[in-house]
Amino acid sequence: MSNFSPVSVLVASLLVAAPAAAKEPTAKIEGGIIEGIIESGLRIFRGIPYAAPPVGNLRWRDPQPVKPWSGTRLAKSFAASCQQDEGKPFGPYTKSFVTSGERSEDCLYLNIWAPEREKVKKPVYLFIHGGGFQSGGADMPAYDGAGLARKDAVVVTINYRLGSFGFFAHPDLSRESPLGVSGNYGILDAIEALRWVRANIAKFGGDPDKVTVAGQSAGSFIVNALLVSPLAKGLFQRAVLESGPELGLPMQALTAREASGTASLKRAGVTDIAGLRDISAADFVKKAASGFPLPIVDGKIIPKNPEDPATPLASEGPIIIGYNRDEATILQGQSIATFKKEVETRYAAIADRILAIYPHATDAEAANSIARLGRDRRVAGMLLWAERRTSKNAPVFAYSFEHVFPGIDPVQNGAFHTAEVPYILGALHFSDATFVGADQKISDEMQERWLAFMRTGNPGKARSKPKWRAASLDPASIWRIAPADAEPLLDAEKLQMFRDFAAKGGKLGLL
């Protein structure tokens, strides 16, 4: 007589037939072995350390090597974002555009999305987040890299030190640094992340000789700095600058920032850098941090102003640059009552020409002209930057993102600052907005062109029409992600006006 019941036989057969659970992916990298997850055909690793925690005695030091670990380190969750104030949704910036996890000085981590199959090396896309050098993090849902990775690429996102932890200078810090400078720790973090990628990305199926470094807003400026930094030479082959400060970001010299650091030391009530390193991050921010620290021209990491056409490129290669139509709705505001004052203050050298071209007889006209003036200024700055940076080995391709984000007031916010990022990365589903087929079509087309650029250096090799050609001083060379009835970009008269303004030292970028 059989000892097996019909039920037990059925259960046993199901157990035999059931496929084995997918084995979690592992990789042996600098420091040791890490374990990630498998999700929808991708290997995903989150919270990978690319440098030692910059805490204690390592606060305000160049990135240091990771301390090796034993066993297998889990890399399944995002690490903390770098030290910053708590982010809260505002305006069009819903929770998908805000870092919501922990914040800590221990933050030098990166994340990787890679196709499960790695028979052929994939192009690599390393994305550097924005946030005015004060906020942001790689854990933001809008920066999820899975969508682009599914198109056969390896996507990397990184954290870098922010605010006074990333851009603090002091004479004693400069003296103790092997480079002899201080104040650009956030830039050094990005360089270290690129170095890590070059050394390790093949373990994830990525091609270290096809690395595109991309950044948005503050991240775009970092990419601009990387282009001229000798320390980043050979670490990437292509670059993308989204909503960057081309011809626009003011930069201080090292000596000026060191003086600011000396004042911070006094405010903290300590006598030396060791004392400043001993106080907590919260106390430092409360007592000693000041102003709006930005990258500086230090003569070593950033040898000269990246926006100066005389500054040579340390890394030559194809570049994509672009702006969103309505950047100013968030960053500039509606100065209706002060239109003339704005023009006469910011554009003194060409104020009469601007006032003659842009209508401002009524509040409504002035409001429209403020928005239009900001758009024209940025387009002109982008084209002039492209003219200065284009070379035989480094063609520049320009775009204008003019698609209105779903559920957003087209007049008040429109194609706002940062709106393009989830379209490029394929992270639309993380937003609170309701996207339709047209949005997915735009995302697919942008990804197709970006992937062609990542693979070949030429986004014009994508199948999409119209053909995207290299930028020139002709506004028609700009690829526009815009509705068919979109108004024309700036004309020749306006372009010449802004060119004259830039020649006299005027700033045309985002800030």
Regions found by a protein language model. Give the residues of each.
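Bacterial N-terminal signal peptides
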Residues: P6-A17
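Non-catalytic accessory segments of hydrolases
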Residues: A20-N184, F435-M446, M454-R463, A484-D485, ...
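Mobile gating loops/cap/lid regions near enzyme active sites that modulate substrate access
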Residues: Q83-E86, A380-L511
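Substrate-access "cap/lid" subdomains that shape
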Residues: K95-S96, R195, A199, K233, ...
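Alpha/beta-hydrolase active-site loop
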Residues: C107, L179-A202, A256-A259
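Alpha/beta-hydrolase fold nucleophile elbow
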Residues: P123, F204-Q216
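Active-site loop->helix "elbow" adjoining a glycine-rich segment at hydrolase catalytic centers
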Residues: G130, Y185-D189, S217-S220
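Short glycine-enriched nucleophile-adjacent loop
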Residues: S220-A232
